[in-house]
């Protein structure tokens, strides 16, 4: 009887360990901030981003950290500005970018906003972890308007303090990953991904390479994922 109990205990332990190892190996469907960041006392909103043929991404918008950025994003979403626009730039192990009416990274809305990040005089406590949403911009610190990106991997060293992070994914990272996996191979840069001569460890050299190889822009218009809508939710989603 004792031997049987020991065998059963060992089997149960093995099953539990297997479950833990399996769950650790699977990418989470949310940014780690969704479980670890305290939102008490903060002004927050939630937005749903619907991407045709891929699914929905729900993001938390932190207006305490980035009030100008969040107000701008909400205004554009409620006006229907994003409806029908596309994710035009996709880079594996970095981010997916959309929100440009020109569909190529050259456009934006009619109004630029002040960049809410440290190098522009605004403290911002949201690091660019996998699942964080942030504003794209040109070389000018106050040039962001409508283009945004969602990190599909951590990019703390290259982006923190330089770009206005304003929220994070609470559900739908699987959608971000699916977009990356399916569409990144359709960029010119994909042919050189993991080429050690052209693609050294993440840092300044990456940006030079991206600029020379189309900057991660999806080559064919038909391959760019379509944003069906972005709507601001009037309820708190479960996550």
Where are these regions (language model features)?
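Cyclophilin-like peptidyl-prolyl cis-trans isomerases
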Residues: 21-239
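Bacterial N-terminal signal peptides that target proteins for export
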Residues: 1-11
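Hydrophobic core
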Residues: 12, 16-20
């Amino acid at each position: 009887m004792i031997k049987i109990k020991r065998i059963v205990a060992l089997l149960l332990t093995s099953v539990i360990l297997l479950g833990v190892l399996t769950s650790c190996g699977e990418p989470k469907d949310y940014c780690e901030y969704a479980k670890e960041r305290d939102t008490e006392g903060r002004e927050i909103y939630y937005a749903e981003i619907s991407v045709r043929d891929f699914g929905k991404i729900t993001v938390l918008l932190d207006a305490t950290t980035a009030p100008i950025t969040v107000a701008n994003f909400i205004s554009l979403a409620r006006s229907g500005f994003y409806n029908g626009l596309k994710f035009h730039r996709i880079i594996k192990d970095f981010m997916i970018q959309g929100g440009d009416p020109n569909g190529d990274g050259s456009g934006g809305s009619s109004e630029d906003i002040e960049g809410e990040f440290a190098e522009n005089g605004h403290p911002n406590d949201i690091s660019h972890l996998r699942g964080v949403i942030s504003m794209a911009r040109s070389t000018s610190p106050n040039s962001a308007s409508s283009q945004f990106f969602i990190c599909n991997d951590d990019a703390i060293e290259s982006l923190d303090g330089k770009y206005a992070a304003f929220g994070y994914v609470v559900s739908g990272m699987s959608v971000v990953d699916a977009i990356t996996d399916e569409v990144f191979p359709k960029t010119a840069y994909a042919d050189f991904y993991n080429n050690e001569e052209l693609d050294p460890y993440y840092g300044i050299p990456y940006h030079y390479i991206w600029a020379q190889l189309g900057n991660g822009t999806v080559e064919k218009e038909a391959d760019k994922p379509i944003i069906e809508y972005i709507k601001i939710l009037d309820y708190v989603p479960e996550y």
